[in-house]
Structures are given as C-alpha cells and as structure tokens.
Amino acid sequence: MFKARIKADSLKEFIGTVGSLVDEAKLNVSEDGIQIKAVDPSHVAMIETNLVKSAFDSFEAKAMEMGLDIDKFKNVLTVAGKEDMVELEKDDELNRLVVNIGNLTRAMPLL
C-alpha cells in the first residue's frame, strides 16, 4: 500500500536530482518516506537521496520497492505548476503508479 500527496516543486526537485544520473530507479518506500539509491549505467557515480515523510502533505505506506522510469515520471510532472499538489498511489492489482495532478490522471507501469 502506498498513497501520498506532495507539492509538485518538492517532487520535481527530488526526481530531477535522480534523473540527472539515471533513467530508471528503484524506490524504497517505508513508513518514514522514500529512499533512492542508484548507480549510473557506467558504474562511475552513485546517488543516494531521501524524501522524508514530513515533506509530504499526507503519506501512508508499507515497506515496498517500486521500479520507476524516471524520464517518463519527469515528463508527467512537467504539467504541474510549483504550487500544484501531486497525488501518488500504487495500484497493487495492476502494478502501476497512479499520478493525479489536478484533473490529469496518469497510470505508469512499474518496472
């Protein structure tokens, strides 16, 4: 189970940092927030970053891992303004991340 709500600018910064190094990443979700550890394709650089629970407007999660195409996620986030709220929810049945930004809903398959 994963359901969260966060300001778009915070999420864009987090994903943008990761996206500067890798195209895909595994998100380690826990009750404390989201952590990403990733190594670039040439195995030269590594990134480890966290988005703590307090950064979210609301956050409910059980420990899990989600593989995500960072480039596609960044493209989805381009429609969000700085102050827009982004709602994220994992669809366990179809193994997708559902992203809601205002009236826009996008379901992204998880890797």
Predicted features and spans:
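DNA polymerase sliding clamps and clamp-related checkpoint/processivity subunits
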Residues: 1-19, 25-111
